[in-house]
Amino acid sequence: MTKFYYLTVLLLAIISCTTTPKTSVTLHIEGSRTDYPTFLNTQDSVYSITLDSTGTAVVNLPENFQPNYGMIRFGLMRFPVYLEPNKSFELSIKIEEHNVTPNFTGEGANKNIYLNSDIFKNNAPDLKVSEDVFLKALEEQKSKLIANLETQNFEQEFVKKEKKRIHYSLYSILPMYISYHPYYAKVDNYQPSEHFYDVLEVAVQEEPELINMQEYKNALNGYIELAANKNMKQHDGLISLKKQLNFIQNNFKSPAIIDFTVDHFISAYVGRYGIVNLSEFLEIYETKVIDSQKKSSFNALCNKWAKISKGQPAIDFKYLDINGKEVCLKDLSGKYIYIDCWATWCGPCRGEIPHLQKLEHRYKNKNIHFVSISCDQNKADWEKMVKEEKLGGIQLHYGGDNTFMNFFMITGIPRFILLDQEGKIIQANATRPSNPETIKTFDNLRGI
């Protein structure tokens, strides 16, 4: 009996010594709202988090995962985190009116305190300044962040990785500058200089070991989009995609990079334009994308677009116009309907307005409605612009209701939609007013 007892104790001791300790992330929310959607994103998983009655939840991570960055999402709030095996931590979030205070504790707290420090807040350079000033500000900000990193006494492996993250987080802003500089600087016909493209080419390198880092993926996608579409004067989604795929083929060798970028750009195209031209690049997708999860998501996306293909009925909407009158889609039946989904802060949207006004004038008294739906969160900005610039057509504000946008899977603006007299879809992603094909399409509409 004694021998059996000691043998059992010894066996349990051996098992306890060889069992890998669990790594957990504990989240605690203190405040008036604990019912926001809550998630933990890791490099390969998304954990949906349900808080208990005390506002607490625990996520146990799998054994033997690789150290990497993640993100805790609570409503619209984002908290970057670094996850390491055997280094559990707790994030307590105290919410008081408009103040949010995160507090990290536990063995894995140090790096997460660093990642959520004030130095990373509001560090984007001013988008209205000139290119030279903007690029100089980027470099200065990078130097500042790296100097701060080197005072933290982290191990060199993390420091090396974090320097890459800092670099790509800043240089992923370059495409944003090109899109928003004309709006903030109030300049027309802005074109990036050759130097700007040169800086981008040097800044973004082929680094497949970083393919799970979100900042790198953002910078890589932005680089490909800008470099491939360089000097492209007329926006055309299909031509742009062909240029992007050709650029990927000619400039990258890593299967991991090719797998990610081909899936990203073809999925983005289908997400915005639908499956009309799918046959032109389906073979490329099937041969270059090897990840089964990506392929499954892509097939699901294509199936969604089949539901808003030509001839399918559009979902109704009910929005207020500039005079406060309620307008429904069914109220507009009997005429063709050309819909512009836009916002005042969107530079490309504003760029289409003069072309849209020409269409409105050309087809005045014709059998077609021109409807503009603003998705501005600040309704006053929309009202001011509509009145000051005397915008025509039927001007509507979405009022926070995304049902119509979600039905048409609108992920970017401007987005144009063409419906027939019965409210059925002709084009779920119609050509823009600036595209000469739009007039050809209108002229071929029966009974316009």
Residue locations for each model-derived region?
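Structural microenvironment flanking redox-active thiols in thiol-disulfide oxidoreductases
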Residues: 351-389, 400-406
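Bacterial Sec-dependent N-terminal signal peptides
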Residues: 1-26, 445-448
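A non-transmembrane, solvent-exposed segment enriched in polar/low-complexity residues
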Residues: 18-191, 198
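Conserved redox-active cysteine motifs that mediate thiol-disulfide chemistry
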Residues: 333-334, 340-358
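N-proximal helix/coil linker or "cap" segments that precede and/or mark the start of modular domains
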Residues: 242-245, 258-320, 325, 330-335, ...
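Short, internal strand/loop/helix patches
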Residues: 320, 383-422
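Alpha-helical repeat scaffolds
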Residues: 182-201, 237-248, 276-286, 315-316
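Non-catalytic, surface beta->alpha helical segment in thiol-disulfide oxidoreductase systems
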Residues: 412-415, 421-448
